[in-house]
Amino acid sequence: MIQLAALVTDVGTSGPFVRVTLAAPTIAPGLAAGRFVLADLGDYLRALLFPARIEAQEFDVLVSPHHPAAALRPGIAVDLIGPLGQGFEIPAATDRLLLVASTAHLPVLLPLTHQKPGSAASLREKPGFSIALLLSAPTAADLYPIRLFPPAVEVTIVTTDGSAGHRGSPLDLFPDLVRWADCACIADDPATYPALAEIVREVRAGSGRRFVQALVVPPMACGVGACQGCAVSVVRGTKLACTDGPVFDLLELR
């Protein structure tokens, strides 16, 4: 864990999000999808930020226009602590990776759609490796633009009102996709997780540990487990999102 003043080098937009680029050469190499930093943005508690794009010297975060980080401007120094937490783990034997996200939670999974030394790159270079994304939103207007994904990512759209893609719920399409996958990573409203877990038990009984991994993000004030404020209920008791997670085996969640 490192504390440093990261320089904002660029601010722009990416679909419905504000994109903020932070130069953090000692933190960026340790980041991965699902790991995070805590940023001092002027409030009493630090703000939780997940990387959406990771390079050797810098990383991007994508936040809603109402997030405190959306007010940052190039040239501002932001005090960061990180990298923190345990991220998504993609087994080296994976040939078929499934990503499941609502647009609101999508930025956490975006590093898995791009090459990154030491993680996704080794998989993306495998012959026959493929990525499928099940992306949901209330309406077409709320979706992250498909054109912003790498061409190799096969995107399936679900909207509640049917204005784009499948009309209904991601639960409608999840069974067939999880049958196909070697590994699945989910970032969505945790209220959907019990139903997703039940589908996994039905169609992929006997799958190995962490076959399906899910993001759980309660308030994380300290990032190091000291405050005990981010407890997550699991099958064998509780774990802390900031140190044991925020990525957990979907089937271990209660």
Predicted regions and their residues:
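Short, Lys/Arg- and Gly-enriched loop/turn segments at beta-strand edges
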Residues: 44-53, 85-96, 242
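Local cysteine-cluster metal-coordination motifs and their immediate loop/turn environment
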Residues: 216-246
